[in-house]
Amino acid sequence: MDKIVIYQILTRLFANTTGVNVPNGTLAQNGCAKFSYFTPRMLAEIKKLGTTHVWYTGILEHATQTDYTRYGIDNDHAGIVKGKAGSPYAVRDYYDVDPDLADNPANRMQEFEKLVARTHKAGLKMIIDFVPNHVARQYHSDVKPETDFGRHDRTDWHFSPQNNFYYYPHTPLAPQFDVQGYCECPAKATGNDCFSPAPSHNDWYETVKLNYGVDYTGDHAGHFDPLPDTWIKMRDILLFWAAKNVDGFRCDMAEMVPVEFWQWVIGEVKRLFPQVIFIAEVYNPAQYRSYIHTGGFDYLYDKVGLYDTLRSVTCYGTSAHQITQAWQQVSDIQGNMLNFLENHDEQRIASDFFAGQADKGRPAMLVAACMNTNPVMIYFGQEVGERGMDAEGFSGRDGRTTIFDYWSVDSINRLYNKQLDKSRLSDDEQNLLQFYRTLLTLCHTERALSNGRFFDLMYANGHLQRQYAFVRADGHEVLLCLANFSDEQACVSVFVPRHAFDYLQLSGGGACVARDLLVNTQETIRFAPDESVVTTVAPWNCKILKISL
């Protein structure tokens, strides 16, 4: 099976060169990317990175401060919308797409369907968000109104298994901040499990929690027989998008929805669309196996684990031996873990809040991409060192690329402009782009990376604190991977125990010529049981030495 490489894109920001970047600017001022920007040439360029799947973030229609009433879409109250553009995770119609992304909003679904077709024709698969835990406070589907959430709820009950929301009967919403006159009565529970009619500014106040039959005020008891109405609605939504040839769903905050629902709904979807993949955003390692073995997820975020460890090694001087402990915690489910260093929730590697320099992400990226056969993901702009240090508006200067505002991201525009002219990229950006292209392409072309076994060398190399070493092998293809998390060039001596040869079923060994696949250079080393490989690795860099035995 080919290794999955996911390229996440915040769709509204992709190659948007139409605006002037006014903080808190409107659509008219700052512009917005369109489905049509993803031309066959543009998609071919994305695939050239080694991409197999594109996660188009922010496809579903969500709350916004932009007026689309002329297209039959009700306005959202500005007091409960984060940013002028709005959060992609405050969905207001599960059956529709964001009109911002269409050249002609009246034809927005047809334009989306054409994007699906172009993506597939480019040899790529499409992933979109499924946001099951919460919806925008003013959710209303103008496409499927007969299935609207809350339409048949008993609003005089705090909880009923057949209600879609949780209510505070006869109690108005009273946030702890100014919502500019927005009224909601009875108040609904807020999306981040805030069971109070008075959410704070730090809560997900723009959303309401969906009810899957769990009585949160009654010892969290589950009432799943008969099937809760929300389950049925959500199954129908997933089937709607699967029928449009979407290849996978990244499921937002999956742990906030009962695993019993996932077990049922994933089975329902895969019965009709067995090829569709489900990726869970999860942060509780104690629940990982339940969401795989019971829930049926194909892949889970490896955030609390590998991501946190790699960030700590990169930024805080943590020993590289901690990487071993991180993968050992999920060794039995390693193939189900999605590795990454950036996404829309996390701070950019090059930001002042992370490493401060994009090149310092190289060794961590080697580990994330090459440690095993499981999927890896990068976030658009990561490959040229986007810093995420703009103050776009609602988001502020926080090291992240905004998901709330209309904006134009300079590095991405210089990378993915309509002419595909990369002459405006700096030498450092060009070099980093080449690194990512080479690394991610190797994940497909080298069988040892796409299908081979993994052997961690750190237990036999206690002296390595700022370097991490492992072997990948498939038959006679052997790769020695080295990551240097140091400001200094490392002259490393890596001991290769006989156990590695036995486990990887290698024979022979001795002096050989090894080729560094990342830069296409050769060096002579000794690779033999119970001997040491001596080589040098540049500061904040890495090597993949291909060894012929």
Residue ranges and their predicted role:
Residues 53-58, 126-130, 250-251, 378-381:
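Short beta-strand segments at enzyme active-site cores
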Residues 5, 525-549:
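C-terminal beta-strand-rich structural cap/linker in extracellular carbohydrate-active enzymes
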Residues 2, 17, 64, 79-82, ...:
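Loop/helix patches that line or flank the sugar-binding groove of alpha-linked glycan CAZymes
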Residues 11-13, 60, 98-101, 132-134, ...:
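Short, flexible loop/turn elements at secondary-structure junctions
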Residues 248, 510-532:
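Solvent-exposed beta-strand/loop surfaces of large extracellular or lumenal domains
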